[in-house]
Swiss-Prot record:
One of its GO terms (cellular component) is extracellular region. Antimicrobial peptide. It comes from the Eukaryota. The lineage of its organism: Eukaryota, Metazoa, Chordata, Craniata, Vertebrata. Belongs to the frog skin active peptide (FSAP) family. Brevinin subfamily. Expressed by the skin glands. The keyword Secreted applies. This is Brevinin-1OKd. The keyword Secreted applies. The modification Lysine amide is found at residue 22. Signal peptide: none annotated. Keywords: Amidation, Antimicrobial, Secreted. It is found in: Secreted.
Length: 22
């Protein structure tokens, strides 16, 4: 369960960083 949450977080992190950097 926790692994899937971390996986989803890792997948969404790049887009999140891109949003912050813009």
């Amino acid at each position: 369960f926790l692994g899937s949450i971390i996986g989803a977080l890792a997948k969404g992190l790049p887009s999140l960083i891109a949003l912050i950097k813009k």
